[in-house]
Amino acid sequence: MSTDTVTEVVATGMPRIGDPAPDFTAVTTQGDINFPGDYEGSWVILFSHPADFTPVCTSEFMTFASMEDEFAELNTKLVGLSIDGLYSHIAWLRTIKEKITFRDMQNVEVKFPLIEDITMEIAQKYGMIMPGEDSTKAVRAVFVIDPKGMIRTIIYYPLSLGRNFDELKRVIVALQTADALSIATPADWRPGERVIVPPAGSCGTAQERVEGKEDGVTCEDWFFCTKEVTEEEVYAAIGK
């Protein structure tokens, strides 16, 4: 496939936040899947990596695998993808478990599915091929998909940069909290910190907030209001 063709696919087929997740069927290291239908009712992190048997990708898979239970507690499932074949995936994951130690992690078994995409069809559908980086490898893309199959977050990393997995977990918690409590989260928010109250929908409500008449709400000005939500309230709201 030429670079011009890949560029055209990316330009016309790039999914966006708020779009339904493009559907596909695939062969994976955990059997065949129908996506996103098989994951209805769960949050999903669908992520791509450039290639098997590469060091940055190895560190990422070990980290994701070590955090899989933490994501499961948030009703979130992990699905990986690269344009390598199934047998390459299997051999790489076996090598990770048997030979690789990274930080305090060793004997790491990757149990979540890793998609075979040797035709690049899925990677193209999700805009994971960036010709400016590499026309034959997927970049480090992350798609957060909600229980209704809608894309809620998209993050891209260049080939040389490993992902921040604590941030990905923070994104999941923040999205679930925003949905459950009808709020927004400020910069660098963590559970237990104050949250953003949606802007007032009327002049009257704005005035009441500024005057401190809305219980639990503190306003710096009419458009910038916060309220306290404890860490316990956050996790109760999202069902953890």
Task: Give the location of each predicted region.
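Chalcogenol-based redox active-site neighborhoods
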Residues: 1-240
